Amino acid sequence: MSDKMDQKEIGKTTKDELALDVAHRESHLEATPQRPEVDHSKLYVWIADSGNDRIQKFDGNGKFLYQFGSSGGTRPPYVPGEFKTPSGVTVDAEGNIWVADSGCHRVQKFDDEGDFLLEFGTEGWGQDKFYFPENIIAESMGTILVVDTSNHSIKRYDDDGEFLLGFGYPGNFDGFLKFPTGIALDKEGNIYVTDRDNQRIQIFNEDGQYVSKFGEYGFEEGRLNFPNGIAVQNDGTLVVAEKSQNRLQVFDRDGHLKEVLGEMGKRDGQFNCPTSLALDPYGYLFVVDTINQRIQKFDPELNFVAKWGVIGKEPGQFKDPAGIGLSWEPDWAPTEG
């Protein structure tokens, strides 16, 4: 038998062999581990619907649940429960909702039904004053951090609105800020701030002391062009939303680029002015895609999963959504092992 014939015979596959190969591959696919199904109906997504002067609540699948708030704030004294361009929202461990009521230069607190509880802050500079605060986040110990954007500072308050701590001054030195916008926390309580007009991310410890920074202005991947939102994954990886560059960039804690996601557009996974981010306990990422008037949802590998929202004033619609906060049913989140 010739070498050519040997090669031909060796390369042949019988019907029985083909059937066995298909069966093997199918059984292998069935045995591949799959991510457990996450019931996002028990997760709640709170949106500061800035242009409609209200807070909207959805489940994690985008189902509208309810809303509260109305337009107000033409001049002080401002009416409790009314808003003027609310820009940030967070939910504390007790289920209370805190809103950075940016245009009224104050913070408002509501119960989980949207009933008004308290307010604090007036326009100005000082411990109990704000100037267009754009974001807010609840800490594990029951305190809240307010991003006092146009005062270039971060301020901590207790659950009664009493001032505890402030840090940040106008400037570009380490620990100084220039129009900070986004804020996030890691498991150790470290504070991550998007120092927007300084084109960088700054990290502070839980006492507000400067730790480190990274970032440099530019359009290339790895550089920053007006970073706005930030979120910290369970492993310490950082996701940064650049509203001027219409993309998300993923960095390690030292600022080394790991991944870039998105571009300008309206399709799934594209963005037009992404402003705020939130991560759920399972690693799903929610993005406020402001000019596209929608929320986009991504899985832990940053694959597009879902979206919801169109422009309008009806329940479930948006007009320039700005802030996002998450809460969930007791025992819904995974336990740390």
Q: Residues of each region from the PLM?
A:
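Eukaryotic scaffold repeat domains enriched in small/polar residues
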Residues: 1-337
